[in-house]
């Protein structure tokens, strides 16, 4: 977010580091959470990327985006959409005692290098209501089946719960997803947790950020990116996570 109350950690002091992480790791495609329109525009100064996504408050530009940014030279967008985590998912709304509207952005893409097709979903589950997180997990499973069908897919985001909690258990027990952290062919690099509370000396314990993959996808590596700690500059209050994968 771009929150004045963040003091020294306001977005104006973080945006350069955020863009440096993106360019240094050269992401082909990635999901973002807690992104306001002005922050999205700052990230789009990286001209190699295009985006899909809308604001959760009005389906246009208001409120948090969960955008998907993709490198246009590597990935072709075919079509896209979004849904809300609520009982009325086709319009801006909230249910299940959710603190606020929650949205999922999705797109169908083609990898220009391999000519393979895949879907990508970017979500942010509610941070207050466990009822909302459980029902959001159920809706995500339902929507992925409806939208992606038999094609490979990636689902990213801050799901605000640990791996042993009910929402993640439901998703993984559906048989439609694998947790990339658990199936990486190489040992995951960096801390398991991602939420560091603006503290370089804090060892994050809670793994609440995920890259969930369709079961046929091969995950070659998983990394929690700690460039912030190494350079002494924060880009976010979460460490980013990254995988290398083969379809």
Each PLM stretch: what is its role?
Residues 131, 135, 145-153, 161-247:
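Metal-dependent phosphoester-hydrolase catalytic domains
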Residues 8-22:
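Short catalytic helix/loop segments, enriched in acidic residues and glycine
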Residues 18-41, 69, 107, 117-123, ...:
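Active-site beta-strand/loop signature of hydrolases that rely on acidic residues for catalysis
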Residues 47, 63-65, 101-105, 116, ...:
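Residues that flank catalytic or metal-binding motifs in active/ligand-binding sites
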Residues 29-119, 223-224:
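Structured beta-strand-rich core segments of catalytic domains in phosphoester-bond hydrolases
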Residues 1, 36-39, 56-60, 75, ...:
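Solvent-exposed loop/turn segments at secondary-structure junctions
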Residues 7-8, 27-29, 125-129:
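Second-shell loop/turn segments in exported
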Residues 1-9:
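Mobile, glycine- and charge-enriched loop segments
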């Amino acid at each position: 977010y771009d929150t004045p109350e963040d003091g020294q950690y306001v977005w104006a002091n973080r945006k350069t580091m955020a863009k440096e992480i993106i360019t240094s790791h050269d992401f082909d495609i990635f999901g973002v959470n807690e992104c306001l329109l002005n922050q999205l525009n700052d990230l789009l100064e990286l001209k190699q990327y295009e985006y899909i996504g809308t604001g959760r408050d009005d389906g246009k530009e208001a409120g948090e985006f969960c955008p998907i940014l993709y490198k246009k030279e590597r990935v072709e967008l075919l079509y896209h959409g979004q849904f809300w985590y609520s009982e009325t998912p086709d319009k801006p709304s909230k249910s299940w005692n959710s603190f606020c509207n929650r949205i999922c952005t999705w797109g169908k893409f083609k990898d220009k290098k391999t000519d393979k097709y895949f879907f990508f979903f970017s979500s942010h589950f509610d941070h207050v209501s466990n009822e909302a997180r459980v029902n959001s997990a159920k809706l995500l499973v339902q929507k992925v089946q409806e939208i992606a069908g038999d094609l490979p897919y990636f689902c990213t985001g801050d799901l605000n719960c640990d791996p042993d909690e009910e929402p993640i258990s439901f998703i993984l027990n559906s048989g439609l997803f694998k947790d990339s952290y658990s199936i990486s062919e190489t040992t995951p690099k960096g801390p398991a947790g991602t939420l560091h509370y603006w503290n370089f000396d804090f060892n994050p314990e809670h793994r609440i950020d995920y890259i969930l993959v369709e079961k046929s996808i091969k995950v070659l590596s998983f990394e929690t990116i700690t460039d912030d700690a190494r350079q002494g500059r924060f880009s976010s209050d979460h460490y980013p996570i990254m995988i290398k994968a083969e379809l």
